[in-house]
Amino acid sequence: TENTVPYGFDFSTPISRFEEAVRLIRLLWESEGPVDFEGRFFRLHHARMDTEPCNGRCPPIWIGASGPRMLEITGRYADGWWPAGAWTPEDYAAKLALVRDSAERAGRDPMAIVPAFILISLIGDDDELDAILQAPLVKAILLQVPAAELRKFGHEHPMGEGWRGYQDIDPGVLTRERILEFLARVEPRAILDLVPHGSPQQVARIVKAYCDAGLRVPKILDYGGMAGLKYAAISAQKVREAEDELMKLTGDI
């Protein structure tokens, strides 16, 4: 909400507004001549889209979706899917199935939607991970996770049972005292239960399970770099090692 509510934008129906916006974008791209549109949120009267697509192709639409309605919208309109929350390979597979089912119902090719994912990971040996997990920015991983999701892994959320994840992150509201209280309550085990961790080879094996679940564009993000320059300096090399191992494991996938 930090990009909407402080500036007076209505955030009460974000999914409905988003869907109408995507429909309108597609309409403008696919129409010739003036466009009239009477929607719940947007209205166009004799609007023109005179910029021609580059080489005859419109830009691909990528949607970051995790909830049921957004997954449905992804299947109807998106060219690529980049979820903001899929914490196990099984969860990823189930959500991808919803996207593809929606695409089929819309008469689209479900296999044409590219499944991607950034996998937040912690790459290092046990001693490194012990130190990394004490860093405030690493603990902040849990701010991205809804309380309901964390509860599935057997943990209560440090921000309380009503925490919704990304949409509740508003620096203007979260006081220094609230963040310090959050950091003091973070359990390292809660983070480790959520994200791939261990050696580059161990992380690669976990990411491989996501590829087996349908992931086709994996991106390994080593969050250990957030623990300070000591770890940031070697983070890229660790990711490269994990990606090289992943290439060996996935073969022709």
Features from the language model and the residues they span:
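Well-ordered beta-strand positions
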Residues: 27, 79-80
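Hydrophobic faces of well-ordered beta-strands that scaffold small-molecule active sites
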Residues: 61-64, 81-83, 113-120, 218-221
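Acidic/polar active-site rim loop that often engages polyanionic ligands
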Residues: 1-9, 76-78
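Glycine-rich, proline-tolerant flexible connector loops at the mouths of alpha/beta enzymes
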Residues: 5, 85-89, 167, 219-234
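A structural motif
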Residues: 78-79, 215
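An alpha-helical appendage that flanks or caps ligand/catalytic pockets
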Residues: 11-49, 90-209, 251
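Short acidic, glycine/proline-enriched helix-loop-strand junctions
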Residues: 166-180, 227-253
